[in-house]
Amino acid sequence: MANSPKKPSDGTGVSASDTPKYQHTVPETKPAFNLSPGKASELSHSLPSPSQIKSTAHVSSTHNDAAGNTDDSVLPKNVSPTTNLRVESNGDTNNMFSSPAGLALPKKDDKKKNKGTSKADSKDGKASNSSGQNAQQQSDPNKMQDVLFSAGIDVREEEALLNSSINASKSQVQTNNVKIPNHLPFLHPEQVSNYMRKVGKEQNFNLTPTKNPEILDMMSSACENYMRDILTNAIVISRHRRKAVKINSGRRSEVSAALRAIALIQKKEEERRVKKRIALGLEKEDYENKIDSEETLHRASNVTAGLRAGSKKQYGWLTSSVNKPTSLGAKSSGKVASDITARGESGLKFREAREEPGIVMRDLLFALENRRNSVQTIISKGYAKIRD
């Protein structure tokens, strides 16, 4: 062992004898060579050929056998270091050196291809991860709802509010799109044009209102204003006609109450005085006048009731049992009864005035009386119709 030759170094400046005997891997922290494109060409010329590698491997094996070393794991002698840094055992290095194929150095195109494939793989991995995360989020919406609920947000209320706002905006757009029709004229333009043409012929005036439709619109608006004014006046007159008279239903004045009390007292005193005079014999009771006054009041009340009912027929129970006069010149039993029989049916009758609701003919006629143009014939015809 003392005469064993000194083992060459592996290119790092450290002798092979100083290194451990069983070293399987080389540290990856420090690359052995600079594999830039410029250095790769120089390295390819300096590396030995496969035949040289075989011969050196054979010499190293025979040298180890002569020295008495039977261990196959000793590093080869006089061999340049390889670029394969992941060597697990010397047996693997021997197999590699004994392989007929030479070292394959990377090329420029290979680097670009490798970079492109690595980028594509990374993108595919990111896309697959993102798609997986999105699918997981879509498949589990309860977690999102729980987070929103914990934050104080009600998803259903927000959705309802969003739908209501969308519907309101749609309805507003629809209302804005609705076209309001133009105001229709008060009178039909064709009828107005025919009437104007007729009046023009009567006045020897050639008029063609169809050429100027603005004239027809002006005449229609003028007629509308005229009719509106007449109807407004008629409504005011009808309200004044149907206005009720205020009746003083409250307490009367103190003067009228005092006068009424005095009149009642005087009447009672007069009746008491008459009774005293009859009792003393100073005055006799007039039975005829008493009967006459009672009969007169009874007939007058019957006539008033008949006039109130509006019937001309008199029933038997409404008349008194006293004999009626046979002629107008006959002597009647009472002054009032004779006056009523003398008047007969030619006398005045009581009737309540009927107040028609709304606008009637006399209201319109009274409204037209204030008009001075072309209303004389209408007023005369209206009053004639009311009289009939």
Swiss-Prot record:
Q: What is its main location?
A: nucleus
Q: Where is this region: Disordered?
A: 1-143
Q: Which UniProt keywords apply?
A: Coiled coil, Nucleus, Phosphoprotein, Transcription, Transcription regulation
Q: Where is the composition biased (Basic and acidic residues)?
A: 106-126
Q: Which GO terms describe its molecular function?
A: chromatin binding; DNA binding; RNA polymerase II-specific DNA-binding transcription factor binding
> InterPro entries attached here?
TAF4, TAF4_C
Phosphoserine modified-residue sites: 36, 49, 80
Keyword flag Transcription:
yes
**Where found?**
Nucleus
Which residue numbers delimit the Histone-fold domain? 193-261
**Biased composition regions of type Low complexity, renumbered to the chain:** 127-139
Which CDD domains does the entry link to?
A: HFD_TAF4 (cd08045)
Biological process, per Gene Ontology: positive regulation of transcription by RNA polymerase II; transcription by RNA polymerase II; transcription initiation at RNA polymerase II promoter
Coiled coil is among the record's keywords? yes
Gene Ontology cellular component terms for the protein in this record: nucleus; transcription factor TFIID complex
Pfam families, per database record = TAF4
Coiled coil ranges: 279-297
Biased composition, class Polar residues, residue ranges: 12-22, 43-64, 79-98
User: Subunit notes for this chain?
Assistant: TAF4 heterodimerizes with TAF12, forming ultimately an octamer consisting of a TAF6/TAF9 heterotetramer core flanked by TAF4/TAF12 dimers on either side, similar to the histone H2A/H2B/H3/H4 octamer. The 1.2 MDa TFIID complex is composed of TATA binding protein (TBP) and the 14 TBP-associated factors. One copy of each TAF1, TAF2, TAF3, TAF7, TAF8, TAF11, TAF13, two copies of each TAF4, TAF5, TAF6, TAF9, TAF10, TAF12, and three copies of TAF14.
Q: Which family does it belong to?
A: Belongs to the TAF4 family.
- Miscellaneous notes for this chain? Present with 1900 molecules/cell in log phase SD medium.
Function of the protein: Functions as a component of the DNA-binding general transcription factor complex TFIID. Binding of TFIID to a promoter (with or without TATA element) is the initial step in pre-initiation complex (PIC) formation. TFIID plays a key role in the regulation of gene expression by RNA polymerase II through different activities such as transcription activator interaction, core promoter recognition and selectivity, TFIIA and TFIIB interaction, chromatin modification (histone acetylation by TAF1), facilitation of DNA opening and initiation of transcription.
Its protein name is: Transcription initiation factor TFIID subunit 4
Query: What organism does the record attribute this protein to?
Result: Saccharomyces cerevisiae (strain ATCC 204508 / S288c) (Baker's yeast)
Q: What is the lineage of its organism?
A: Eukaryota, Fungi, Dikarya, Ascomycota, Saccharomycotina
